[in-house]
């Protein structure tokens, strides 16, 4: 727990469709909810499917999860015109003023997606092995500039002909000293490392 009250930490989670963003949010919420006061905001273009999935998974009580329909390019709603998400954050913090963390999941987007610094204090970008071992070296702000990069679904590497060693090497070249984690989120592989990063960088831990 935090030793003193600070403004809620806003953690943006981005990445392509199907990379594991909603799974990451579910796992983070279930692992952290006993220690921290959490709320979550999900973005979808025309539905609130990710909100529904988070709710039925029991990640958080339904009133602590808000779905936002962006109605257009999901990148715009987290970067160029983040007003719809900034309003959602304000509404959630009005309901839960003691929240320690606000998770904000972007809609699925391409490698160019980034969060506005107005919206997110920490950015986590999720890619997955099933997209091919070439993904890290394609670059883009999500891969090169995010605070933490997650390479998810490492268990699928043998089935898609991807080399985890090549992906790790390419990621180091693209990110320099910026951290990344190899994960199998469905089995909670790498989850503890992600939580430690959030606690350390977000100044949550005592």
Swiss-Prot record:
A cellular component term, taken from the record's GO annotations: cytoplasm
Its GO biological process terms? urea catabolic process
- Its domain of life? Bacteria
Subcellular location(s) per record = Cytoplasm
State where it is primarily located: cytoplasm
Q: Where does GTP bind?
A: 15-22
Q: Which UniProt keywords apply?
A: Chaperone, Cytoplasm, GTP-binding, Nickel insertion, Nucleotide-binding
Does the keyword Oxidoreductase feature in the UniProt annotation? no
Annotated GO molecular function terms are: GTP binding; GTPase activity; nickel cation binding
Cited InterPro entries: CobW/HypB/UreG_nucleotide-bd, P-loop_NTPase, UreG
PANTHER family linked: UREASE ACCESSORY PROTEIN G
Tell me the protein family, please.
Answer: Belongs to the SIMIBI class G3E GTPase family. UreG subfamily.
Q: Describe its assembly.
A: Homodimer. UreD, UreF and UreG form a complex that acts as a GTP-hydrolysis-dependent molecular chaperone, activating the urease apoprotein by helping to assemble the nickel containing metallocenter of UreC. The UreE protein probably delivers the nickel.
This chain's function reads: Facilitates the functional incorporation of the urease nickel metallocenter. This process requires GTP hydrolysis, probably effectuated by UreG.
Q: What is this protein called?
A: Urease accessory protein UreG
Organism in which the protein naturally occurs: Ralstonia pickettii (strain 12J)
* Gene of this entry: ureG
């Amino acid at each position: 727990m935090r030793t003193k009250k600070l403004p809620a930490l806003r953690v943006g989670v981005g990445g392509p469709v199907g990379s594991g963003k909603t799974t990451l949010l579910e796992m983070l919420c279930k692992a952290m909810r006993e220690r921290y006061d959490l709320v979550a905001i999900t973005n979808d273009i025309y539905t609130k499917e990710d909100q529904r999935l988070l709710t039925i998974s029991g990640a958080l009580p339904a009133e602590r999860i808000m779905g936002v329909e962006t109605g257009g390019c999901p990148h715009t709603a987290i970067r160029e015109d983040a007003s719809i998400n900034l309003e959602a954050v304000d509404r959630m913090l009005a309901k839960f003023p003691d929240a320690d963390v606000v998770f904000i999941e972007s809609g699925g987007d391409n490698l160019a997606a980034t969060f506005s610094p107005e919206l997110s204090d920490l950015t986590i970008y999720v890619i997955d092995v099933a997209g091919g071992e070439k993904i890290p070296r394609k670059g883009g702000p999500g891969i090169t500039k995010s605070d933490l990069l997650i390479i998810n679904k490492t268990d699928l590497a043998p089935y898609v002909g991807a080399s985890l060693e090549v992906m790790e090497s390419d990621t180091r070249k693209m990110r320099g000293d910026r951290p990344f984690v190899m994960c199998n989120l469905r089995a909670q592989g790498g989850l503890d490392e992600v939580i430690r990063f959030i606690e350390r960088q977000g100044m949550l831990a005592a």
